[in-house]
Amino acid sequence: MNKKVKHGTLLTVIFTVLSLLYLYPIVLVFINSFKKKAYISKAPFEIPTGKMYVGLENYIRGIKQTGLIQAFGWSLFITILSVAVIILCCSMCAWYICRVKTKFTKVLYMLCLFAMIVPFQMEMFTLSKIANMLHMGNPWGLIVIYLGFGAGLSVFMFTGFMKSIPLEIEEAAMIDGCTPIQTFFKVVLPIAKPTCVTVTILQAMWIWNDYLLPSLVLDQRKYKKVPMAVQYLKGGYGSVDMGAMMGTLVLAIVPIIIFYLFCQRYIIEGVVAGAVKG
């Protein structure tokens, strides 16, 4: 009993320390977002008071300099549509793999698994050239590319869950007059809701925070996501408006933190459901 208590206490201490280490840079950015530029480098660890404190000035300047509101709009548009396309296409692909047992479906599943382990850096320059040749430097082209990169993990998760769905349920739906498409949308997809939620959260966080792929593909004169807007604060010769940078960073990370805190319990539920039933 004492060993269990000591082991539990040790784990609590370790995870508490790790949590503080993860929170430290976020708290530091938040504190410095209310300081004058000169004090961010001179006194980065001090609470902003008196002459240091500038209120919301850094936030306002950051929004004006980066076009952050427009970037938020494009990020929301790209993230929502990309996730919707990934959920629709990957769930249907997983259902096909589970229900049609052929060499083709086995190869298709193995390709999805292989796609999960191929580093993006190996193909990013070739991808950039192909996207430019096909005139995909717009949000619609980026959504198609996100589907390609998000398919591996999503198909893997959906397949693990759908293998557990009894075939008798689908047969009963077809006896009642449902077509295969109706069976999928009215029976299979609602049952797979935990996995849908988990995939939605994981893909949304990845797509919202992604900087490298859109910076290679998008026409930055017309379109930019939030991470790209933050990059616009870097001036010539490496000069940076640190005050505006801190304010913009806070605005950029707050939505995804709120989204994760609201949905984190669904991640655990979805992963557990897929692990137990798959």
What positions do the PLM features span?
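A structural signal for multi-pass alpha-helical bundles of membrane permease subunits
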Residues: 2-278
